[in-house]
């Protein structure tokens, strides 16, 4: 089995605040074929901001 063809690949979520802070998570390609956008806490700026999937 190839890792690249995995249904749940590991993706990085990078902060849109420009701090460079990232979360690492897994996503289901069948349910979320587009890039993920999640609102999470960025400890560098101490507030909730959008995190976008980074490839």
From Swiss-Prot:
Q: Does the record's keyword annotation contain Ribosomal protein?
A: yes
- GO biological process terms on file: translation
Could you list the residue ranges forming a coiled coil in this record? Answer: none
Q: Which InterPro entries match?
A: Ribosomal_bL33, Ribosomal_bL33_CS, Ribosomal_bL33_sf, Ribosomal_zn-bd
Q: Which Pfam families match?
A: Ribosomal_L33
Keywords of the record, alphabetical order, are:
Ribonucleoprotein, Ribosomal protein
Domain of life, per UniProt, equals Bacteria
Q: What Gene3D superfamilies does UniProt report for this protein, alphabetically?
A: Ribosomal protein L33
Gene Ontology CC? cytosolic large ribosomal subunit
Q: Which residue windows are transmembrane per the record?
A: none
GO MF annotation terms: structural constituent of ribosome
| UniProt record similarity statement | Belongs to the bacterial ribosomal protein bL33 family.
Q: What is this protein called?
A: Large ribosomal subunit protein bL33A
What is the native source organism of this protein? Answer: Kineococcus radiotolerans (strain ATCC BAA-149 / DSM 14245 / SRS30216)
């Amino acid at each position: 089995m190839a890792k690249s063809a995995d249904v749940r690949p590991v993706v990085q979520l990078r902060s849109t605040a420009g701090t460079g802070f990232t979360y690492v998570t897994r996503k289901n390609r069948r349910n979320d074929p587009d890039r993920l956008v999640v609102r999470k806490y960025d400890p560098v700026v101490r507030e909730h901001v959008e995190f976008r999937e980074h490839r």
